[in-house]
Amino acid sequence: MVNQSSTPGFLLLGFSEHPGLERTLFVVVLTSYLLTLVGNTLIILLSALDPKLHSPMYFFLSNLSFLDLCFTTSCVPQMLVNLWGPKKTISFLDCSVQIFIFLSLGTTECILLTVMAFDRYVAVCQPLHYATIIHPRLCWQLASVAWVIGLVESVVQTPSTLHLPFCPDRQVDDFVCEVPALIRLSCEDTSYNEIQVAVASVFILVVPLSLILVSYGAITWAVLRINSAKGRRKAFGTCSSHLTVVTLFYSSVIAVYLQPKNPYAQERGKFFGLFYAVGTPSLNPLIYTLRNKEVTRAFRRLLGKEMGLTQS
């Protein structure tokens, strides 16, 4: 095994062969990051400060917003430095931290999105028992389970990836330190790591996504049985935002972690990795707020209070 502590780190290639594209991506990534900071911070503040948003749905949403803030902050600053300047290296320690955070928070988001689907299932299919089933204690327990599973997954998979003997050039064909990219960088047999990724993908991607699809199948069946068109629109409206987020997140993560072994898929995987690391966290607040009248009204109430305090 190579002594990784004595190595200078890795070279993140990204799109270094296209300098013009890197400048464009710098603007896109910076804009997305600023939107992520503002949008997700606003959702957390509204969920905490507005009593009308003190419900399980917004508790889970604020968890998702906090998770997205941490997720993007773990990689975007380094990514911006690499996109803007000639220096595209990352130290072994920074790469290790980045992988650990990526795995932990990515896994947590997979589980949390499943929990949110369960919350919507109970709200639509068992409305009379919703308050009894989804009580505050259960909310905290489910959120804690999501975070713990993410931590355990990262503790298990990060060391086995970082202890691989890497090729001397240490050129990572990606924007960030991702597990698939580092496995491809190894000069020796990586069958164990590939099996580990495949097994983890089943439990973290396939199983949660299947549960989400089952939940939304039951939700769709229940909504179609509602007699009034207004009731159907309201029920679908509360679930469409979450389903959109699930589609964007899972499609991009699956494209990165379950991609076939060919150069085209790997090149495409870089774009998908960039999208789920930067794009989805910036879009989530917009998706959840644009069609959500409760959040819009909460923002107006908060803005009205601030205006009143300023005038007084």
Curated annotation (Swiss-Prot):
Q: Tell me the SUPFAM superfamilies matching this sequence.
A: Family A G protein-coupled receptor-like
GO annotations under biological process? defense response; detection of chemical stimulus involved in sensory perception of smell; mating
Query: What kind of membrane protein is this, topologically?
Result: Multi-pass membrane protein
Q: Give a Gene Ontology cellular component term annotated to this protein.
A: plasma membrane
Q: Which cysteines are joined by disulfide bonds?
A: C95-C187
What residue ranges lie in the Extracellular compartment? Answer: 1-23, 78-98, 157-193, 258-270
Membrane-spanning parts: 24-47, 56-77, 99-118, 138-156, 194-217, 235-257, 271-290
Cell compartments where the protein resides: Cell membrane
Q: Name one Pfam family in it.
A: 7tm_4
Residue ranges that the UniProt entry lists as topological domain Cytoplasmic: 48-55, 119-137, 218-234, 291-312
What UniProt keywords apply to this chain's record, in alphabetical order? Cell membrane, Disulfide bond, G-protein coupled receptor, Glycoprotein, Membrane, Olfaction, Receptor, Sensory transduction, Transducer, Transmembrane, Transmembrane helix
Q: Which molecular function term from Gene Ontology is one that the record holds?
A: G protein-coupled receptor activity
Residues with an annotated glycan are N3
PROSITE patterns for the chain: G_PROTEIN_RECEP_F1_1, G_PROTEIN_RECEP_F1_2
The family note in this entry says: Belongs to the G-protein coupled receptor 1 family.
Q: What does this protein do?
A: Odorant receptor.
In Swiss-Prot or TrEMBL terms, this protein is called: Olfactory receptor 2H2
